[in-house]
Amino acid sequence: MVCEGKRSTSCPCFFLLTAKFYWILTMMQRTHSQEYAHSIRLDGDIILGGLFPVHAKGERGVPCGDLKKEKGIHRLEAMLYAIDQINKDPDLLSNITLGVRILDTCSRDTYALEQSLTFVQALIEKDASDVKCANGDPPIFTKPDKISGVIGAAASSVSIMVANILRLFKIPQISYASTAPELSDNTRYDFFSRVVPPDSYQAQAMVDIVTALGWNYVSTLASEGNYGESGVEAFTQISREIGGVCIAQSQKIPREPRPGEFEKIIKRLLETPNARAVIMFANEDDIRRILEAAKKLNQSGHFLWIGSDSWGSKIAPVYQQEEIAEGAVTILPKRASIDGFDRYFRSRTLANNRRNVWFAEFWEENFGCKLGSHGKRNSHIKKCTGLERIARDSSYEQEGKVQFVIDAVYSMAYALHNMHKELCPGYIGLCPRMVTIDGKELLGYIRAVNFNGSAGTPVTFNENGDAPGRYDIFQYQINNKSTEYKIIGHWTNQLHLKVEDMQWANREHTHPASVCSLPCKPGERKKTVKGVPCCWHCERCEGYNYQVDELSCELCPLDQRPNINRTGCQRIPIIKLEWHSPWAVVPVFIAILGIIATTFVIVTFVRYNDTPIVRASGRELSYVLLTGIFLCYSITFLMIAAPDTIICSFRRIFLGLGMCFSYAALLTKTNRIHRIFEQGKKSVTAPKFISPASQLVITFSLISVQLLGVFVWFVVDPPHTIIDYGEQRTLDPENARGVLKCDISDLSLICSLGYSILLMVTCTVYAIKTRGVPETFNEAKPIGFTMYTTCIIWLAFIPIFFGTAQSAEKMYIQTTTLTVSMSLSASVSLGMLYMPKVYIIIFHPEQNVQKRKRSFKAVVTAATMQSKLIQKGNDRPNGEVKSELCESLETNTSSTKTTYISYSNHSI
């Protein structure tokens, strides 16, 4: 304000502020006005505010520090460049000039808040009724600029602080660099928009990168503040939602770290050595100091850095720390270098850029010189000539956010342009409706803009004021002592990554691992650690289980076993008893010998059918018995043959039939002998049914019971084959086999043989009863010896057969035991009953002659005398009894000796 009267620059004005807020504002404007230039001010019809980090943070007690050439001056000049371009464009805001009021935030949120109060001065009503000049005249106030919109700020923490003030006064704000997800909250920051995507998109891209590289165990590192903490929070939330990525630990870098703080952070990160990947949402200075600490602790090649856009493709954080940073994957919003700005900025000089109040300071910093006696550089520095040129006498590279600053300014300009078209149709310049711009109405136009930005990409906003996510993905690589940030992919709602272009420490192209637990081998399932789904122990799927998925094993079906990797099931091999097996060779050999011997006996008996020995043996029952013996040998071949329906049918029929033939014939013989001698003790009348025809009827009646039982078995359970997978289901699935066999259970087998065993036992009983019959009269004793031996064989068979029920060799042992037992039984019968007769027929034909027949009366006499002498047997030796019986018989019959008894005509 100025006072009328004396027009001197030192006109004293005394006034009393009626608003404390305004007093604070005024004092703030004067603070450090001598040390730092306050702002850039360009007049125009519509004034836009600008917030840029021209200076870094100052030390304690000092708000501002060193000049930031790129982030400060480059971005600031980008806004001025955009304003110039818009004001020169006849098609954009024609006849309307944009002005600016640009302030320095000094990279500090609290200082930026103080500065931003400048933007709301015009909206604060002031009561100056009590303010008087020294001469009593009322003061004249300089009218503050009415700010229609604000471009900025850069840091998310600064934008959040400023947005809280601007929303109260309904001033739209467009940021060119703030990416904190918190700013997407349209209920709290409803007047905030941005031309850069929020960190939620960036976090999604980083999660996709981590997932694509197969990393599931990572640590996070954030600078304290909205940018770092919100970015890490977004990454954590997204990784939790999609699953598959676990956070080993989260570290935070304090705003004002103590000495040694960064070394402590690195050591804490090393406590989880498997979490090599580190997700970084940190500012540039913190990134540099973290890399320094890692280098100091000699951790080159250990950490796999994933940096946010604050790292991007900057050289400063990795300068002199290239080996530590090698392989770092960084992300940056897709951008392009603006050629027009390069030409503009290179042409800036001290003479043509006086509107930038910080440009002189930039000039000194950029060229390393001093401007006159008022320069801020030390006195021993060379003086600036003013003839220096940017990019000729100094290095120059366009700062990465220049494109977004220009797009932010153009977004505001297009919104104003569209607003003017609707509110002031056909009006040249500002119409009355736009003299005072309604911020809420302008916000609607901002959110509706859609144009191609300075890089040719569309500029749009969603309902929360966020720009779409478009990122370039870089990797810091070292090749032949040269370094570069190489583009390895991009992200636009989904990841496109060229893994083959990636290079890691020591020039390795195979990407390293960052996992809590190594992948389980095939056939192993994961047993996760409680609360840490990315960490697990591997458990092998044991027995007949196979790996269904990563977390579970399941049992294979009964007819299958796990494959070699236990990742699936395969059919269990089917086996049967093969002819070449040792278990089959021995029974077959015995059976063949037995069949040959039996055939030889039958042929011999047929050849000498009418000789006394054959006739005395009872030809009819002998042939029945020999048939049974033959069948007992033959069953071996049926038991070893490959099972099918026909073979199974024959097995059922002949399994017990051979024994039934044999023991039915023997039982009939022993029963006949027993009845004859028992009848002889009582009377001289011959017992009934002792003729050959009667004997055959009895024998076949006994055999018919077996056949009837087999017939019932056929009806109840038709024969068929099965594959028994339980018989050889060993503990080791590799040895498991399915056994192809007939569906004959052990119980069915016992039932089939049970009747024959019953005949055998009965026959044995009769053999015992007739053991005292004189051997010159009958075959009782050979039959008895046969039955005793047979019983011993079958008593040995039972424990062997049933004792191997759980053995893996069950099929072989049981089949061999059964066939050998039947062959041995047949061999005993053949050897004891017929081989002596064949021997006499072949080698002693002189004994095969007709002897005097014994009448039934002689048998009765022998039986009676035997009965009497048995009573004396208790007092005499066995030999004496036998001798006396023989002598008595010889005297009674007037014969010297009779060896065989004739059964013809009821004689013995």
Swiss-Prot record:
Changing K872R: No change in sumoylation. Abolishes sumoylation. GO terms for molecular function: G protein-coupled receptor activity; glutamate receptor activity; group III metabotropic glutamate receptor activity. Strongly expressed in olfactory bulb, accessory olfactory bulb, and mammillary body. Weaker expression in the retina, and in scattered cells in the cortex and hindbrain. Keywords: Cell membrane, Disulfide bond, G-protein coupled receptor, Glycoprotein, Isopeptide bond, Membrane, Receptor, Sensory transduction, Signal, Transducer, Transmembrane, Transmembrane helix, Ubl conjugation. Its main location: membrane. The keyword Transmembrane helix applies. This is Metabotropic glutamate receptor 8. It comes from Mus musculus (Mouse). The gene is Grm8.
